A protein has these predicted regions:
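Active-site neighborhoods and metal-handling regions in enzymes and metal-associated proteins
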Residues: 1-373
Length: 373
């Protein structure tokens, strides 16, 4: 039985509408994030692969189904799947996953992997917006990720290398049942130079940025923490500037969702926020994030991006200002902006959105943890 059964009535309603709109009999998902969206479980054995070891499907006549091989079937049935899913197993030596699905699915059908004769499905629109059950799971997930990254931030020392800190982060996440496709650690030498500070064998030194993207049950969380031992004199001002851009992005996201605007409209507000905090061109140095949910980012905003901004939905904006970064996963609804990656064990800073974006939005966001060397 899947430990995190998804809201299957909602999934069925969305998939019925998709089949009707596209004149199909079935749709299949073998990519891990969409498999997790539909089942609440995992089809991953090889973390480097973009396709899992099973495909979850919805059949107009037969309902929820899973196709896998004889190696994986017993484990998936016992540990990863709700009982409502019917399972079929092909001999491991006989067929590829694509061939096994093709042999068992009614047609016409669609899939998120290449299957001869099947249409292609982009599941991102099906995964949005979030349901109440998704949101409840997200709150627990966000708290667990925050606890993991903060436990490491509270224990590192200046002589730790970036790779040692990254190893500690992965361990803290794994013990909480979380898989982390992204773990970044940038010390005082490299964090000001690079936006993606992939860990190296260098000491973190005077301060460090710790950034992770982790997932469980299909849902993804991204967040960053800053820990300082002998902080550069510019760090506090740059961190506050990044936080203010993030809060402005969240305010603009809520406005866009209410108005039916798109990602490009939010990006314009982000550009305005950077200008307001004195870093007008800084947005050109790094992507700013976007919608989270059942992917690290369902979409990443750009100046001309036309993705519709929806609510309720999780968003992870990640503005940077030359060695400082503010990032968290936040639930945006019609009437609330709720940070998900928070605990009571880290210092916070209350910051308002810039006036050109919103004059009445103020949020508490993670601040810099100052520690003795």
């Amino acid at each position: 039985m899947s430990p995190q059964t998804p809201p299957l009535a909602d999934r069925r309603e969305r998939l019925d509408a998709y089949l009707d709109d596209h004149d199909l009999q079935a749709v299949w998902f073998a990519r891990p994030n969409s498999f997790g969206w539909l089942t609440g479980g995992s089809n991953v054995v090889d973390r480097e692969g973009s396709v899992g070891v099973a495909a979850a499907g919805y059949d107009r006549e037969a309902g929820f189904r899973v196709v896998t091989d004889t190696i994986e079937a017993p484990r998936l049935r016992a540990e990863e799947l709700p009982d409502v899913f019917d399972m079929e197993a092909a001999d491991w030596y006989a067929d590829s996953l694509a061939d096994a699905v093709a042999a068992r699915s009614p047609t016409p059908a669609a899939a998120d992997i290449d299957i001869a004769g099947f249409e292609s499905v982009d599941a991102s629109s099906l995964r949005q917006p979030l349901t109440d059950v998704d949101i409840d799971r997200y709150r627990t997930l966000g708290s667990d990720v925050a606890a993991a990254i903060e436990s490491v931030g509270q224990s590192v020392v200046p002589t730790d290398t970036e790779r040692e800190v990254a190893t500690a982060l992965r361990a803290a996440l794994e013990t909480r049942g979380l898989t982390a496709p992204v773990v970044l650690v940038g010390g005082s030498e490299r964090a000001p130079q690079y936006r993606h500070y992939t860990p190296k064998n260098v000491e973190i030194g005077d301060y460090a940025l710790l950034s992770v993207t982790a997932h469980r049950g299909g849902l993804y969380v991204s967040t960053t923490r800053t820990v300082a031992f002998d902080a550069p004199e510019w760090l506090a001002d740059r961190h506050r500037a990044a936080v203010r851009v993030e809060v402005s992005a969240l305010a603009a996201t809520q406005q866009a969702a209410a108005a039916g605007d798109d990602a490009g409209d939010v990006f314009a507000a982000i550009q305005d926020a950077y200008a307001a905090v004195g870093w007008a061109d800084e947005w050109q140095q790094h992507h700013q994030g976007g919608a989270a949910g059942f992917a690290g980012r369902e979409w990443i905003a750009t100046p001309d991006h036309e993705a519709t901004v929806t609510a309720p939905m999780a968003y992870a904006w990640n503005p940077t200002v030359q060695g400082a970064k503010s990032e968290g996963t936040v639930l945006v609804t019609d009437d609330a902006i709720e940070p998900l990656t928070t605990t009571d064990n880290w210092p916070t800073i209350d910051v308002a959105a810039v006036d050109t974006v919103a004059d009445d939005v103020r949020l508490s966001r993670p601040s810099i943890l100052h520690r003795d060397p």
